[in-house]
UniProtKB/Swiss-Prot annotation:
This is Bacillaene synthase decarboxylase PksI. Belongs to the enoyl-CoA hydratase/isomerase family. One of its GO terms (cellular component) is cytoplasm. CDD domains: crotonase-like. Its main location: cytoplasm. Homotrimer. Does not form a heterotrimeric complex with PksH. The keyword Isomerase does not apply. PROSITE patterns: ENOYL_COA_HYDRATASE. It comes from Bacillus subtilis (strain 168). One of its GO terms (molecular function) is lyase activity.
Amino acid sequence: MTHSVVELIEIESAIIQVKMQDRTHKNAFSQELTDDLIQAFEYIRQNPKYKAVILTGYDNYFASGGTQEGLLRIQQGLTKFTDDNLYSLALDCEIPVIAAMQGHGIGGGFVMGLFADIVILSRESVYTANFMKYGFTPGMGATFIVPKKLGFSLAQEILLNAGSYRGADLEKRGVPFKVLPRAEVLDYAVELAQELAEKPRNSLVTLKDHLVAPLRDQLPRVIEQELMMHEKTFHHEEVKSRIKGLYGN
């Protein structure tokens, strides 16, 4: 099943792969990719035969965060990152989601992957929460999920400094994720999904509900706080010029 920029691949009867492939925007969150992702997870929600989801990108890209146009619209006060609830698609999905981040994860794209239940990184790929590079504070739940998944000290560095890290660098820093050569990421994700699919669906759903309940409970308050910080930090001329001058560099 293929939407224009998201392909749904049924690997086995109980395992579905959500492949993001907006090559025009290098998997940045274009309106097309956003809409197709939301539709893909709605399709999964309506199909109770599935027990595991593998979320992945194409070639060297996992997901690249906001488009330049999208960031400028937020800067101008026309939209908010909450208008399209991409960040919690994996968290809200009933069944386990594996983020097979075979390619670069940039900004909100990296954050979206971290909301998955299981995360796999690629040694060669670059991962960054680069919000502060443009001069605005992080959104999409980054200030919540990055510390939760990577640990507070590393998260502070990643969020404040907005630096770029190869998967191999993060492996040396002790991230709790499997870090593999890019060519092996998807195969490993499929192996994990097959192991998940051996379990009863009801038990998978029940346990995920229990494990992520604190995250689901706390996230809305954090999103409110991030929006308040955006009101303080986003609507400045310096941010506008940074988005125009630094985007894609």
